[in-house]
Amino acid sequence: VVLVAHSMGGLVAAWWWAFLSEGIDVAEIITLGTPYRGAAKALNVLVNGMRIGPYVPQAVTDTVRTWDSVFDLLPHYQVVEGNADSLYPHDLPPAITKTVDGFSDKARKAYRKNRRLHKALENKVAESGRNPLTAYYSQGHATLGHASIDAQTNRLAVAKGNPRSIPQSWEGGDGTVPVFSAIPDVLEDDVPSRRRLRGKHQDLVEEQLVFKHVSEYARDRLPPAARGAQRHGVTAYLQVDLEDVVPSGLETEVKLRVVDEDGSVLDAGNVGGNVGGKRFLANRRDDGWWSAQLPALEEGVHSVMASATEVPGVGRVELQTRVGAAS
């Protein structure tokens, strides 16, 4: 059995292997942007409401708050900074989470279930002597990662970037899931089982590297002498800071930059792209990023193609993603 699972589906696949796969020959479980340690975006949605562009549709928010599966996606790491008594979501004061019925109990239950999963995966690997997990992730796109309690408003502020306790090499993510969350405990020291992609969260299922990876299972098995441990890396990445949903009818800022595998910023000759059939050209900033104004978009989902040219030693780097527009 070969499983390919995106986002939360990877948690389902990992749980199945850890607890329910006895007697089944599992060749590989490939997860794409799976929030093994949760995502701050879920915390923001539950506490501050589901946002569609600048709007917070209350009916949608009320419905989402009734789904236990969203609590499973809460950060299971120390996401809250500046308050020693409230490091995890389930520790947050009732005044912060009062709009969500039973928040603390549900968050604590989800945290314990998550820790149970990680422990079960470690035990399964130790007992079976093998680890079928391969975790694909994307890094560098601006991603919600930490939270703090605003002293003036006494509200929870969820912001982009990892908590200060996380090393800089793990900064960023796929726009939804921080890169360190896409790596389960059991793969922390298994570098060959971690592979980097280019795109944002919703685009990972369309990456050619994943397709090529899965396509290998359609081949006849090669003899051991012909097998090699080849890394599937690339040398440059185009990073994008763009909200998943933007207001329709208004121009929206997008920021882009090119980095290498170590996160060092690379120079480029031109950066720009196309969204909804309309071209845009980015201007160089002083901080390594390029900035552009996306043209006003009609309501709906639009394809975005961004590219950087004249990247030293690489040439052209491209990224394809999507953006929603809503009013």
Where are these regions (language model features)?
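Short, solvent-exposed loop/linker segments at the N-terminal edge
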Residues: 244-250
